Amino acid sequence: MDENEFDNQRENKAVARVIISFLKYEEYALKEIYNLRVKKWASISDRQKDMVPNYTKYLANLKAAIIENGKFFRSVAEYALQSISFEPGEIVQPNDLDMSKTCSLLTQVYREWSAEAISERNCLNSRLVPFLKTLSPPKADILIPGCGTGRLLVDLSRMGYNCEGNEFSYHMLLVSQYMLNAGLLQNQIIIYPFIHCFSHWKKIEDQLSPIKVPDIEAWSSNKGMGSMSICAGSFVDCYGRNQGTKISSHYTFSRRMQLSRAKAENSKDVVVTNFFIDTGSNILDYLDTIGHVLKPGGIWCNFGPLLYHFENDHGVETTYEVNPYSGFQDKINDYTPLMGLELSSDDIISIATNHLDFELIRRESGILCGYGRYAGPESCAMPGYMCHYWILKSNPTNES
């Protein structure tokens, strides 16, 4: 089996596992969040049941909401299966982590594609859009790593920008494919994005709020505007440097990716990182990659918290360098922790300006932004994250 065949088989197995997790959502959610609450309700005394007379109705509504969410995920899976087929050996059953990611997609779809979450999207857009309008050329090439289910791509391409998204998660990629390409009409789908969160509610009915998505028709909204595409894979692997980065779980030595990285050099006018830079186990790889992919004089716009995804992860990986002439591994580090390098915003700005030849144009801190937060007027849900916003400009004479 050659390198490409191996990569394709591995990718097919990963995609199959995600599609099956979509198909199993209803079964999983009924088991994990509904059946257990029914059992708890059955266990209490009749006297206590009389104290909460509406709880039986609540449980029935919770079950109905799970079933509706299941319809959404089945639609996503069925759409994906129109263009993907699998060999029997590629069918892999999802694990609990896969199912948890599937459940969390409801929050992501609500955040990106509902009218109710426009205030969350505007935390970035109200800052980014006016700045982009000052740039030349007006048809800038924009890269959005960690593009999620694709809403920011749509919004910016509608303004005339040529947008390329990058996404590592197959969960996100399959949902984005559906939201962008399935010809969905405005408010065609109803989801119940809050049913996996049982805390902080003022009224129990709010947890069962139905949300209509999408609030725009993405498939028709960018006609005659800028281009839009999505590249699947690790940001560092697809766009990073070919030298000076160690091989790891997110960076490979394959010939195909080497060519991709060479092509990416100095190719973008703007990189927009939105709730992204805290997602990697080595943020310096991200910073190097941003510097590599931007054209001289290019702009890096960042928005989001620094809630490092791996700060409490005790997992390990092997990292190493590869001799470009012999192909042998060198400087091998076994059991490299995934945690570590949780840099502050001051650290990041300092590295960018002092080592990567960026100039700081604008900076804000302490911006409160929700993340899939229920938007009701009396919401007691967690308020969200304290976010950082900055704009950095690469040196116009900089050569990667």
Swiss-Prot record:
Enzyme Commission code: 2.1.1.22
Cited InterPro entries: CARME, SAM-dependent_MTases_sf
Note: Present with 952 molecules/cell in log phase SD medium.
Superkingdom field: Eukaryota
Keywords carried by this UniProt record: Methyltransferase, S-adenosyl-L-methionine, Transferase
Protein family: Belongs to the carnosine N-methyltransferase family.
One Gene Ontology molecular-function label: carnosine N-methyltransferase activity
GO biological process, one term: methylation
Temperature-related behavior of activity: Optimum temperature is 30 degrees Celsius.
UniProt binding sites for carnosine: D278, H309, Y385
UniProt keyword Zinc-finger present: no
Record note on pH: Optimum pH is 7.0-7.5.
Catalysed reactions, as listed in the record: carnosine + S-adenosyl-L-methionine = anserine + S-adenosyl-L-homocysteine + H(+)
A Pfam entry, by short name: CARME
Chain sites annotated for binding S-adenosyl-L-methionine: Q108, R111, G146, E167, F235, Y286
Protein name: Carnosine N-methyltransferase
Organism: Saccharomyces cerevisiae (strain ATCC 204508 / S288c)
Function noted in UniProt: N-methyltransferase that mediates the formation of anserine (beta-alanyl-N(Pi)-methyl-L-histidine) from carnosine. Also methylates other L-histidine-containing di- and tripeptides such as Gly-Gly-His, Gly-His and homocarnosine (GABA-His).
Keyword field contains Isomerase: no
